[in-house]
Each structure stands twice: as structure tokens, then as C-alpha cells.
Amino acid sequence: MAPGRVGLAVVLWSLLWLGAGVSGGSETASTGPTITAGAVTNASEAPTSGSPGSAASPEVTPTSTPNPNNVTQNKTTPTEPASPPTTPKPTSTPKSPPTSTPDPKPKNNTTPAKSGRPTKPPGPVWCDRRDPLARYGSRVQIRCRFRNSTRMEFRLQIWRYSMGPSPPIAPAPDLEEVLTNITAPPGGLLVYDSAPNLTDPHVLWAEGAGPGADPPLYSVTGPLPTQRLIIGEVTPATQGMYYLAWGRMDSPHEYGTWVRVRMFRPPSLTLQPHAVMEGQPFKATCTAAAYYPRNPVEFVWFEDDHQVFNPGQIDTQTHEHPDGFTTVSTVTSEAVGGQVPPRTFTCQMTWHRDSVTFSRRNATGLALVLPRPTITMEFGVRIVVCTAGCVPEGVTFAWFLGDDPSPAAKSAVTAQESCDHPGLATVRSTLPISYDYSEYICRLTGYPAGIPVLEHHGSHQPPPRDPTERQVIEAIEWVGIGIGVLAAGVLVVTAIVYVVRTSQSRQRHRR
């Protein structure tokens, strides 16, 4: 009987061992139907090292399918290295989900994913770009897919509306909305019609659109159901709100949707240091030209590497023109030319394209100081001479006599001579003495902008005319008058003879 007792003891011990294993499996499965990819982090719930559960694989409920989202979640964020898998055992379904991490939404959720490109909803139209922002002069392509367009005689019309200060569409339309049985709002220009032979003859086509446009700015390509609107060049004139209307041939406005095209152009930066005369303050002008849209432009000025903080020294103005906007900023130094060395100015321009993107550029230039010339005027017997020493090359004189605002440059002769300073020259101009005026003005012209007017005034009594010369002049004048009277008389006689002969000829024909 000893072997029987031994066998009974072995059976009882095996049942006890098996019960312990089932109890451990149920405890592990109570955490939910997820797969445990790693060791248990709570030490109070971990099995002892000598128990069979120490080498166990993840617990799986074979009677129900585990949530795949939970599997992915636990695999991607393990807290400890994964343990070898164990044999799955049947367990009961948990009554409550784990409280540590909520279950994500199932994969068949219909909410569109948020990404850079729009998804394809089951609506009547889908466009890949509803609000493109393009650089000036670039080419823009918008691809739209029209549902059920191949099942009917499809017709597409595209209208453009401006986005100026007084847009024809107010309030701004919803770019995601699809309209039904809505005709195009008034004030638009037609840029495309897939059936141009059916277009209303009173419709206004946009520039570069319509039959015979050369060169064409708009085109629509691609086989249905996908159409691609191509704008050849984005400018302030071609940007705006585009209304796409489509439907059957007999109902082209069955559906409609909006697309917005916006343009941007960073400014070009130039710096022009002013050439100043001795005794004038240094100046420099920075220009941010032809940018769009009219977003803030900020200038920071530096004079010899020192920032100019005084707002009274900086004058900034913005001007609007057809191609965009231009901002001009001028800084005036507290230093004076001739008293200190020439100044170096640096302009730092920042233009904000939007709340995130901006452009920043720098420009540097050296302001020059020109010596103040000395102007002299000398009267001779028959000529008057005006001289200016050490002026920039290209500077010349303009003469004015009395109150006559017209310069007497036709009678002046100007010559330039070398000066001791490089880039400068001495200018001398001569003018015949006038018999009609006593006041003379010689004015320097050709200086850079910002230089004050430099001129010299002189007086000289007109000399008496030579009697013989005066008689000759009067005789010539009388001869001219006589020739004019004679020519007029000849014309009158010729006209009379012509009229008489014409009258006689008519009388002969009547007889």
C-alpha cells in the first residue's frame, strides 16, 4: 500500500500546484484584455522568483480578441525590458478598463486626421489647396476632384474676385463650404468656362482668360473627375477669391465652392548715404521696396556700429503703388560734416510676412562730405565769367538773366579744369554780355539730392548799342517785314484769280 499512498500524495501535490498556477493567471488577467509586453512594475503584485509565473509570457484571453490599439500602446511605451512569452490561459473578461491609460479611439473612427494636406471627404468636391500662399510671379496649381462628374455632361466655371480694401464679397466666404444652386456673386471676372460656346456674351473675362487670350494666364487640365486649375503667374491682379461652380450643362451652378489665392513678396533693400556739404548733418536713407502684403516693416539704424535710439532722428514713411508697398526710412545724424570724419551707416530691415515668418536684411554705406565751393563772377567787355573751385565731376553752371526763369544755357560755354582733390574739378563758364538785362545768376547744377542750391548773383549795366549796328538791325527787321507783306499780297492775288477762273468755268458749263 505504500506505493498507493505515495501516488495519492503526488496527485494531491500536483492539484495544489495547478491551483496556485491558475490563481496567479487569474490575477494577471484581471488587469484587462491587454497583452503585457514587459515585467510587472508593481513589486507587490510580481510573482516570486521560484514560481512558474516568473517565466510566463503575456496573458491572452483566447475567448475574446484583444484590442489592437492597446497592444500597440503597450509595445511602444514599455517601462522595462520585455519578458519571454508564456502560454496563454483562459481568464474572465474584466469589468472595468485600466485607470492608468485610457483606451484610444478605434481605428474605424470617421474623424479626419489632422495633417498638412486635406483628406478626401465623401462630399461633392475635394481640393488639395484651399488657401495657397505663393511668392510673387510664381505658378500656382490647385487640384480638385469632382464627385460624379463623369456620370453627366459636366460643365465647370471659375470666377475671380478681388481682395482689395472694398472686396465685392462681404463677409468673407467659408472655404470649406459647398454651396448648392447658388449663382456666382456679382462683381467677379470669369477666368475659365469648360463650355465657352455657351458663355453669356455679356460676361466680363479676366485679363489673360477667355478664347484668344495671348498669353493665357489661366488653364484647367486633367481628365475628369480631377481638374487642375493653373494660374501662370501670381500677381496683385491675379490673387483673390476664386469661385468654382459646376454641374450639368443645363445647370452649371448646381454646386459651388471657394478657393483663396494669396500672394507675398519680400521687400528689396537699398541704402543711399547722402553726400553732405561741410556744415550739414550726415544723413542716410534706407528703402524697402515693392513688398506685399502691407505687413509691418521695422528699421534699426546704426551709426558707426552704435544703434540710433532717438526717434527724433528717424523719419519713416510708407507709400502704396500698384505693385505693392514701399517704406522709406531716413536717419539724420547729430554729427556735422567737416567737423568729424565721414560716418558709416547700417540699416537693418525686418519684414513680417505673417505671425511666424519674417525676412531680415542689412545694408551698409559711407556718407561723404563735399567741400563748399567758392563761386566768383567777373564781367569783361563782351563776356561774363563764373568760376567754382573743387566741385564734383559732372557739376556745371546754369545761367539766368533778370526775371527770366529760362536758363540762357545756349549762349554759355563751360570748361572744367583739374583740382587738387581727387574726384573734384574746377568749373568755369562764360556768357556774352546782355544788352537787355542787368542781373546775372550763375547756378551750379548736378549736385546730389539734398545739397542746397549753390549760386552767385551779379549786376552789370547793359552797354550802349553801336548806332551803326542798331541801324543794320533795324534795316534787317524792315526788310523782313516787307518780304512778309509782299508774300501775303501774292497769296491774296493768287486766291482772287483762282476764284474768278473757277466762276467763269462754271458759267461755260451751264451754257
UniProtKB/Swiss-Prot annotation:
Transmembrane intervals: 481-497
Region (Disordered) residue spans: 42-130
InterPro entries per record: GA_GC, Ig-like_dom, Ig-like_dom_sf, Ig-like_fold
UniProt topological domain (Cytoplasmic) ranges: 498-511
Membrane topology of the entry: Single-pass membrane protein
Disulfide bonds: 127-144, 286-347, 386-442, 390-419
Residues that carry a glycan: 42, 70, 74, 108, 148, 181, 197, 362
Role this protein plays: Major attachment protein that mediates binding of the virus to cell surface heparan sulfate or chondroitin sulfate. Also plays several roles in host immune evasion by inhibiting the host complement cascade activation, and by providing a shield against neutralizing antibodies that interfere with gB-gD, gB-gH/gL or gD-gH/gL interactions.
Gene that this polypeptide is encoded by: gC
Signal peptide: 1-24
Regions of this protein lying in the Virion surface compartment: 25-480
GO cellular component: membrane; virion membrane
Location in the cell: Virion membrane
Other noteworthy facts: There are seven external glycoproteins in HSV-1 and 2: gH, gB, gC, gG, gD, gI, and gE.
Protein's name according to its UniProt entry: Envelope glycoprotein C
Biological process, per Gene Ontology: adhesion of symbiont to host via host extracellular matrix; adhesion receptor-mediated virion attachment to host cell; symbiont entry into host cell; symbiont-mediated suppression of host complement activation
Gene3D superfamilies: Immunoglobulins (2.60.40.10)
Compositionally biased intervals (Low complexity): 43-80
GO molecular function terms attached to this record: complement binding
Family: Belongs to the herpesviridae glycoprotein C family.
Domain named Ig-like: residues: 267-359
Native species: Human herpesvirus 1 (strain 17) (HHV-1)
PROSITE patterns: IG_LIKE
Positions of region (Heparin-binding domain): 137-151
Subunit and partners: Interacts with host complement component C3b; this interaction inhibits host immune response by disregulating complement cascade.
